[in-house]
Amino acid sequence: MSLRFVISGTDTGIGKTVFAAALTHALEAHYWKPVQSGLEEETDSQTVARLAGASHARILPEAYRLKTPASPHLSARLDNVSIDPARLLPPRPDGPLVIEGAGGLLVPLTDRLLFADIFALWQIPLILCARTALGTINHTLLSLEALRHRAIPVQGVVFIGDEDRENERVITDIGAVRRLGRLPRLPELTPEALHQAFAQHFNLADFLEVPA
């Protein structure tokens, strides 16, 4: 079976789309964003295509494209759309697949369904993106508890931001989770700079073996 990963985060706006682009490039993977909320600016799929240098064929169409940049349950309500979980089954392309959620794990898709509930059904190894800054210990450990409560397989944690060895140590030790690497903030976010940063700060072998 081809490699498949879910990319989620401890919060919104932490850089998980940028990391998803880096991983998509490194694995020469397909990319899928199940639900896109907000269409006026560059979408996550467009960002990944640009930063990963991925062809149109490797960027799989979203199941839902919602106009309002908000939590999917609200965006869908404003668009008069009903999100059907049956439409959120992961595609099976020929080759690796990177799937990106929205916001954090407990972001609602509907009034009764969270992203974490869908991830639990999928049973695809999840990579948790976390900040390095103040507050990340609590946010990340809570996210890991939510994952384990639902028996979602965890590939590891990716830190994003300036180096903070103590925060990273505490999270990996107390959270009993693998540190996959840290993506630093890039002065200029170009495809070349991103690919170089991934090569310098991550070991691709960590993404070629998945939890049993």
Curated annotation (Swiss-Prot):
Pathway: Cofactor biosynthesis; biotin biosynthesis; biotin from 7,8-diaminononanoate: step 1/2. The keyword ATP-binding applies. Pfam families: AAA_26. Substrate binds at S37. Its EC number is 6.3.3.3. It is an enzyme of class 6 (ligase). Its cofactor is Mg(2+). ATP binds at G13, I14, G15, K16, T17, V18, E100, G101, A102, G103, P184, R185, L186. This is ATP-dependent dethiobiotin synthetase BioD. The lineage of its organism: Bacteria, Pseudomonadati, Pseudomonadota, Alphaproteobacteria, Hyphomicrobiales.
